[in-house]
Every structure is written in C-alpha cells, then in structure tokens.
C-alpha cells in the first residue's frame, strides 16, 4: 500500500548556473553585425577598471558583491530609507523607489548618509537598524504639535513631531483577530494544506484560494490574480509591481467592509462573549472595558 501511495515529494524552486560564454560587441548596436572578436564579461570599462570575470563564473556572485560593496553606498542609502519609511510613513527621500535625478531630494541628507554608513558598519543588519530607529528620540516623540511647528512645518517633513498613521491592511486584520482572542500566534509552518499548483486557475475556473485562517497576516500567501479582499480595500500594493510607497485612501467600501465583513463580525462576537462572561461588571463597566480594550 505504501508503494502504491507514496507520500508527496517536497519540492522547491531553485536556481542553477548555466554555461557562461563570452559575447561579441554589436557594431553600432545592431545584433546582426557582431564584431569579429568576443569580449570578456566585466563591468563596463567606461565606468570601472575592474578585472574581467572568471571564465566559468555566471557573474551573479560578482554582481551581488558590486551591489553590496562599501564603495557603493547607494544600496545602503536606499535600504535605510525604506526602513525609515516603514516606521514613519514617509522616507527621508519621499520617492522611495526613485533615488535618481527625477526623485525628491532628501529632507535630512546628513542623517541619511550617517544611517547608511552605520548600517554597513553593523553588518547590514535590518534588525539592528530597526532597534536603532525605534529607540531614537525622533521615533518616540508625541504626535502633539505646537502652533509654531504647524505653521513652519505643516506636513511634518522636518519631523518636529511623531506622524499620525493609519493602520495598514495586515496589522488591521491581525488587530481584529487579536482583540477577539482569535489570533493564532504560531511561528512558522503553512497556512494551507493543499499543493501550490491548486492556486493556479484551471480550465474549469476552480479556485482553491481561501483566507479563512487565524494565522498572522505575515503567513497569508499573496496570489497575484486573487488578492485577499481586505488587502485590496485597504491599499495593499499591486503584487505584480514594485511599490515602496503604499497609497492611503479613504473610500466608502472600507466602511462597508468594517460593518459587514464576516471577519469583523466574528471578531466582535468573540469580544462580546468574553465581556458577557465577566459577571462582576455591569453594562456601563462593560462599555468602558470595551472602549479601553479596543
């Protein structure tokens, strides 16, 4: 019986090196007129005097080293700016995905450079960078602003106060489950029990995708052609594109979802049942407890 019904083989996508080859320069950019001699693979000579790549190497390792080289601080500056944006809602460079000539100038260039240097000196550790930012006086400021600060810096570009931020889609969902005592805090593992190929629509339009799970949103899969409806409503970015700055919209369907969603109803019902079990509280005290809890 075991031979007739073997257990499924665990598989994963992988990458292998192909056969490296040298290529000729195309005369005047025309692929139909290649030069007679082939050129060794290397970073463009007009930009660098580095050595050619080893004959059998794919070049991926060399590319990774170029990107993460301390002589190329752009990578570190882009990364620390993204982490800053995660915590403050706005990066030191507002155009998170564009550090080029058409992007915005940094609001605090010295701070951006210092953070980039610190990040590289500390082994490119995102965990340490998060700790540094979250323990800073800037992050721990109050959202209250003085009249003079509002007048001089209405958009809080200069960080005179902590920014007011709305919950994004993932923490909004997790907060609802946590308030209802329903959030599954298990670490690791899978949300679904079926194989990945079932997530692809077949000729019968069958779709096995479901988001009925109490696991944290971190573990929910992102299916590009079937994004979770809560995520779509609350400005989850298009998974098919690069987007370092999420939109921040306020639309009627968001309110309708919070009034009628099965997830919200399930969470609120769980909260209500827990409050009703506390016999020592009267209704007024239950309302106060609920207000403080939520």
Annotated model-derived regions:
Residues 216-222:
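Short beta-strand/turn segments that mark the catalytic/cofactor-handling region
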Residues 1-214, 231, 237-246, 259-294:
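Primarily short, surface-exposed interaction patches in extracytoplasmic proteins
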Residues 251:
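Active-site-adjacent segment of 2-oxoglutarate/Fe(II) JmjC oxygenases
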Residues 223-227, 235-236:
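Short Ser/Thr-interspersed hydrophobic loop/turn segments at strand-loop and sheet-helix junctions
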